[in-house]
């Protein structure tokens, strides 16, 4: 079975799945096609993997994308999708949410955007071999809203439907009993969706069967880390959408009644503002330079809690999976794709609500394992679902 993946960059959040597929299918049957070279700053931190023989630089006209028995694409390429549909070939289109703030749903009123979205919805409605893989429940709701609107349900101009879903890669999405947006076109649309995300490298230091390690876990210093108190970690670019100020305030206020510290690794335009906020709390918050990707996991093993504080701009947030792999307690926002999809509601707070985050840090947090959200599980789902397409002779 010839399988191709089409994306914009070579990402460390996509390569684990790529390698899992190569292991299952063989290198001769798999191609990873990317459109852009990685920017130098990210390349220096470990992004990029052009050395793999199955990685190709190209565009939507690259021959292997149409030759593949199965294509998974993170690029919106309706011309390619329609061509493959006419030839009866299986295509999975995956994306983060369609209507990120602040523009949000207003994007649908841009003529070119509306036309592109209508073509995608038409493929979902009319082609049995075209599927949508939403990167999180917010992306699924956005697509369901589009489907309802394109099928004449004008209520979808004002709200997105609430959906239920199976919490696993390839999990089904359900719209039964949903009243929002009526039912015109929504049920048919979600029947062609399967839950998706980014899948990270499995931890080499996972102890026992962490996948089964569920239950209430009071946040405290991990003895194996060799420190007292609670160490909170945040890693990334210091951007406004990341809402790192929320963590600083929550940890700072917590520090008045318990031993807790916050380590921030990264730089960005918000750095000066964040340091001013942190200065109010003495040495509770420490800032560090960015570190390469392969060192982030080591930091996670030295800390107790990871907080994903991003607002709705965060389409996914693969760091949630990385932290779970390393056995950390993880708290995230309702607005970010990964936390809303993977974490239990007891571990969630709304972006910017530092008081709720403080409450979570002071109380009990459900410590969960990565569960089925692994590259191996995702690869097995894809190959199992598409096995009937037949086997090719390689590229």
Describe the role of every protein-language-model region.
Residues 344-355, 362-365:
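Conserved acidic donor-binding segment of nucleotide-sugar-dependent glycosyltransferases
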Residues 275-291:
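Nucleotide-activated donor-binding/catalytic signature segment of Leloir-type glycosyltransferases, i.e.
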Residues 133, 194, 198, 227-242, ...:
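Conserved donor-binding/catalytic core segment of Leloir-type glycosyltransferases
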Residues 290, 298-303:
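Short alpha-helical donor nucleotide-sugar binding micro-motif in glycosyltransferases
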Residues 362-395:
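A charged, aromatic-enriched C-terminal amphipathic alpha-helix characteristic of glycosyltransferases
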Residues 329-332:
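Short hydrophobic beta-strand element within catalytic cores of glycosyltransferases
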Residues 297, 320-325, 339-340:
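Short alpha-helical segment that forms part of, or immediately flanks, the ligand-binding pocket
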Residues 110-132, 141, 145, 177:
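Membrane-proximal helix-turn-helix segments that form the acceptor-binding/catalytic region
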């Amino acid at each position: 079975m010839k399988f191709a993946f089409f994306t914009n960059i070579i990402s460390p959040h996509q390569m684990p799945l790529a390698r899992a597929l190569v292991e299952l299918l063989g290198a001769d049957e798999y191609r990873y096609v990317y459109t852009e070279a990685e920017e130098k700053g990210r390349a220096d931190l470990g992004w990029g993997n052009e050395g793999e023989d199955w990685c190709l630089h190209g565009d939507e006209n690259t021959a292997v994308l149409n030759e593949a028995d199965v294509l998974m694409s993170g690029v919106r390429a309706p011309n390619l999708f329609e061509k493959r549909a006419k030839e009866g070939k299986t295509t999975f289109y995956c994306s983060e949410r369609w209507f990120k703030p602040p523009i949000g749903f207003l994007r649908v009123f841009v003529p070119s955007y509306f036309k592109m979205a209508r073509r995608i919805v038409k493929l979902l409605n009319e082609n049995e071999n075209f599927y949508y893989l939403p990167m999180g429940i917010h992306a699924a709701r956005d697509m369901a809203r589009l489907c309802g609107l394109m099928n004449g349900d004008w209520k979808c101009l004002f709200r997105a439907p609430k959906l239920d879903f199976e919490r696993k890669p390839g999990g089904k999405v359900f719209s039964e009993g949903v009243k929002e947006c009526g039912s015109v076109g929504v049920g048919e649309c979600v029947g062609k969706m399967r839950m998706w995300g980014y899948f990270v490298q499995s931890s080499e230091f996972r102890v026992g069967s962490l996948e089964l390690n569920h239950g209430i876990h009071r946040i405290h210093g991990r003895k194996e880390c060799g420190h007292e108190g609670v160490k909170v970690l945040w890693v990334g670019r210091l951007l406004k959408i990341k809402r790192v100020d929320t963590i600083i305030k929550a940890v700072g206020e917590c520090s008045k009644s318990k031993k807790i510290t916050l380590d921030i690794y990264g730089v960005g335009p918000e750095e000066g503002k964040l340091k001013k906020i942190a200065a109010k709390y003495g040495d509770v918050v420490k800032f560090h330079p960015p570190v390469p990707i392969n060192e982030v996991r080591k930091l996670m093993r030295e800390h107790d809690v990871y907080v994903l504080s991003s607002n709705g701009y965060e389409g996914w947030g693969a760091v949630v999976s990385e932290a779970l792999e390393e056995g950390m307690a993880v708290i995230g926002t309702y607005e970010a794709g990964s936390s809303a999809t993977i974490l239990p509601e007891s571990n969630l707070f709304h972006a910017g609500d530092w008081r709720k985050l403080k409450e979570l840090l002071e109380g009990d947090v459900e410590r969960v394992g990565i569960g089925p959200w692994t590259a191996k599980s995702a690869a097995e789902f894809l190959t199992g679902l598409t096995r009937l397409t037949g086997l090719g002779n390689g590229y």
